[in-house]
Amino acid sequence: MFSLKLFVVFLAVCICVSQAVSYTDCTESGQNYCLCVGSNVCGEGKNCQLSSSGNQCVHGEGTPKPKSQTEGDFEEIPDEDILN
Protein backbone atom coordinates (compact mmCIF):
# COMPACT_ATOMS: atom_id res chain seq x y z
CA MET A 1 0.00 0.00 0.00
CA PHE A 2 2.85 2.39 0.86
CA SER A 3 4.54 1.62 -2.47
CA LEU A 4 1.38 2.53 -4.37
CA LYS A 5 1.14 5.90 -2.59
CA LEU A 6 4.80 6.57 -3.27
CA PHE A 7 4.34 5.69 -6.94
CA VAL A 8 1.34 8.03 -7.27
CA VAL A 9 3.28 10.90 -5.70
CA PHE A 10 6.26 10.22 -7.97
CA LEU A 11 4.00 10.13 -11.02
CA ALA A 12 2.36 13.44 -10.06
CA VAL A 13 5.75 15.11 -9.63
CA CYS A 14 6.93 13.83 -13.01
CA ILE A 15 3.81 15.16 -14.74
CA CYS A 16 4.19 18.59 -13.11
CA VAL A 17 7.86 18.86 -14.02
CA SER A 18 7.27 17.79 -17.62
CA GLN A 19 4.64 20.51 -18.10
CA ALA A 20 6.80 23.33 -16.73
CA VAL A 21 7.63 26.03 -19.27
CA SER A 22 11.28 27.00 -19.40
CA TYR A 23 12.68 30.10 -21.03
CA THR A 24 16.16 30.16 -22.54
CA ASP A 25 18.58 33.06 -22.26
CA CYS A 26 17.90 35.71 -24.88
CA THR A 27 20.61 36.07 -27.51
CA GLU A 28 22.24 39.09 -29.14
CA SER A 29 20.05 38.76 -32.24
CA GLY A 30 16.91 38.54 -30.11
CA GLN A 31 15.50 35.45 -31.82
CA ASN A 32 14.64 33.66 -28.58
CA TYR A 33 11.28 34.26 -26.95
CA CYS A 34 11.32 35.71 -23.49
CA LEU A 35 8.94 36.32 -20.63
CA CYS A 36 7.92 39.93 -20.52
CA VAL A 37 4.84 40.52 -18.39
CA GLY A 38 5.30 40.00 -14.67
CA SER A 39 9.08 39.71 -14.70
CA ASN A 40 11.89 40.37 -17.10
CA VAL A 41 14.14 37.41 -17.90
CA CYS A 42 16.06 38.97 -20.80
CA GLY A 43 19.16 39.97 -18.82
CA GLU A 44 22.35 41.61 -20.10
CA GLY A 45 20.70 45.03 -20.52
CA LYS A 46 18.04 43.75 -22.92
CA ASN A 47 14.32 44.41 -22.67
CA CYS A 48 11.27 42.61 -24.01
CA GLN A 49 9.51 43.81 -27.13
CA LEU A 50 5.87 42.67 -27.27
CA SER A 51 4.58 41.58 -30.65
CA SER A 52 1.82 39.40 -32.06
CA SER A 53 4.36 36.78 -33.15
CA GLY A 54 5.82 36.52 -29.66
CA ASN A 55 7.94 38.44 -27.21
CA GLN A 56 11.55 39.05 -28.17
CA CYS A 57 14.55 40.44 -26.32
CA VAL A 58 15.90 43.63 -27.84
CA HIS A 59 18.45 46.28 -26.93
CA GLY A 60 16.89 49.58 -25.93
CA GLU A 61 13.60 50.47 -24.30
CA GLY A 62 11.44 47.55 -25.40
CA THR A 63 7.70 47.70 -24.74
CA PRO A 64 6.62 49.20 -21.42
CA LYS A 65 4.91 46.84 -19.02
CA PRO A 66 1.19 47.55 -18.55
CA LYS A 67 0.47 49.58 -15.45
CA SER A 68 -1.61 47.98 -12.77
CA GLN A 69 -5.20 49.09 -12.43
CA THR A 70 -6.12 51.27 -9.50
CA GLU A 71 -9.43 52.52 -8.20
CA GLY A 72 -8.91 55.92 -9.86
CA ASP A 73 -8.61 54.35 -13.34
CA PHE A 74 -12.36 53.86 -13.72
CA GLU A 75 -15.28 56.24 -13.72
CA GLU A 76 -18.06 55.30 -11.34
CA ILE A 77 -21.41 54.54 -12.99
CA PRO A 78 -24.43 55.87 -11.08
CA ASP A 79 -26.89 53.23 -9.85
CA GLU A 80 -29.79 54.73 -11.81
CA ASP A 81 -27.86 54.26 -15.08
CA ILE A 82 -27.27 50.60 -14.27
CA LEU A 83 -30.88 49.88 -13.31
CA ASN A 84 -32.42 51.53 -16.40
From Swiss-Prot:
Keyword Signal applies: yes
Stretches for region Disordered: 53-84
Ranges of Acidic residues composition bias in the record: 72-84
Pfam family name, one: Hirudin
Region (Interaction with fibrinogen-binding exosite of thrombin): 73-84
Region (Interaction with thrombin active site): 21-23
Sites where a glycan is attached: 63
Compartments, record wording: Secreted
Coiled coil: none
Record's signal peptide: 1-20
Keyword Disulfide bond: yes
Keywords: Disulfide bond, Glycoprotein, Protease inhibitor, Secreted, Serine protease inhibitor, Signal
An annotated GO cellular component: extracellular region
Cited function: Hirudin is a potent thrombin-specific protease inhibitor. It forms a stable non-covalent complex with alpha-thrombin, thereby abolishing its ability to cleave fibrinogen.
Assigned protein family: Belongs to the protease inhibitor I14 (hirudin) family.
Name the UniProt record assigns to this protein: Hirudin-HM2
Organism: Hirudinaria manillensis
